[in-house]
Every structure is written in C-alpha cells, then in structure tokens.
C-alpha cells in the first residue's frame, strides 16, 4: 500500500466513524425527544399518546358517513389526562356545547393555532398568556365523542388546517 493510499484509507475511516457517531447521536436525541414529548421543530406534544384517528378523509365513527374530513388527530388518553401548551401563546377561544364539547384554541408566537376538544376540564380563559409546557386542560369525553380522547388540531398562519402528525407528532 502506498503512502497516498494509506492516508486515503485513514481519512475515509475517520469520515465513516464520524458519520456513524453523528447518526448514533441523532437517533439518541430523537429517542429522548420522543420520550419527553418534544419535537425537533421547537414544539412539545400536548400529550404523549397513540394516534387513533388521523387527519384527512375518513368514515365518521359516530354517524358512519363515509368520506368525511377529520380536521385534526385523535389521541387516545384516559379522561383526566393533563394537556400542555405545545408552544407559548395567547388563549384565543374557550367554548363549550358544540361537537367538540369543551374546547380551547391557542394562537402561538409563530402564527400557528392549536385546538383541543372533548376536554373534561379547562384551566385557562380567553386572553390568558401561556408558556410552553403550561397545563391548560384535562382530556375528557365531552361533545360528539366516542370515548375519552384529545382531538388536536393545527392551523397554519394562512388559516388552513394542517396535519399535526406531520409537524408535531412525526
């Protein structure tokens, strides 16, 4: 082996080891973020839970009507599970009595809005300032619901509903 080939081999080995270390640490960081409920985009998850109904077209579980649009994701949690604000913001809406039962909408500092429905207890009022991680409510089974869960929505600054799974639960 020539000196040039030896240096090339050593350099390539060093690059491969460095790349392996970076990949290993990225996986560890992603695992820790997932365990803590955090995401790489700066959001935290309002609750760590299994997604039981995805964003998009589906069969309505209450009516059986096909091709209805589900504007958020459903997260399976027992009634009384603490719900946290995923990012700082201002409580824009607190309401009850509709299909979502007890609901909250928060406008966040990045222009996005998050919505929370079927809550058993709301701990904030309209105009409240919330910090990331603040306890805002407890999950429940109010409104048009088939069982205890959190219906979680994400609205872009343009006003269009987007899939929370892609941005916060990925």
Positions of the model-derived regions?
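Residue-level recognition of beta-strand microenvironments
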Residues: 54, 88, 94-95, 122, ...
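Short histidine-centered loop motifs in beta-beta connectors
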Residues: 84, 94, 109-133, 157, ...
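Short hydrophobic beta/alpha edge segments that flank linear recognition/processing sites
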Residues: 75, 103-106, 131-143, 152
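Short, basic/aromatic beta-hairpin or loop at an interaction surface
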Residues: 63, 68, 106-115
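Single-pass alpha-helical membrane anchors
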Residues: 2-32
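Surface-exposed, glycine-biased beta-strand/turn segments
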Residues: 29-102, 132, 162
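Short, exposed beta-strand-loop hairpins at the edges of beta-sheets
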Residues: 152-158
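Short polar/acidic secondary-structure junctions
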Residues: 80-81, 96-97, 141-144, 155
């Amino acid at each position: 082996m020539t000196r040039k080939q030896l240096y090339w081999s050593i350099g390539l080995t060093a690059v491969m080891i460095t790349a392996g270390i970076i990949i290993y640490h990225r996986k560890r960081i992603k695992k820790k973020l997932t365990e803590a409920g955090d995401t790489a985009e700066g959001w935290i998850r309002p609750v760590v839970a299994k997604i039981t109904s995805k964003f998009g077209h589906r069969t309505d579980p209450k009516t059986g009507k096909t091709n209805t649009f589900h504007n958020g994701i459903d997260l399976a949690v027992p009634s009384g599970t603490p719900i946290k604000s995923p990012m700082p913001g201002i409580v824009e809406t607190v309401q009850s009595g509709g299909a979502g039962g007890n609901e909250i909408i928060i406008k966040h500092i990045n222009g996005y809005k998050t919505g929370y429905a079927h809550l058993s207890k709301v701990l904030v009022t309209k105009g409240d300032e919330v910090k990331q991680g603040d306890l805002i409510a407890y999950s429940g089974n109010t409104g048009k619901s088939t069982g205890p869960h959190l219906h979680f929505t994400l609205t872009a600054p343009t006003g269009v509903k987007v899939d929370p799974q892609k941005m916060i639960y990925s």
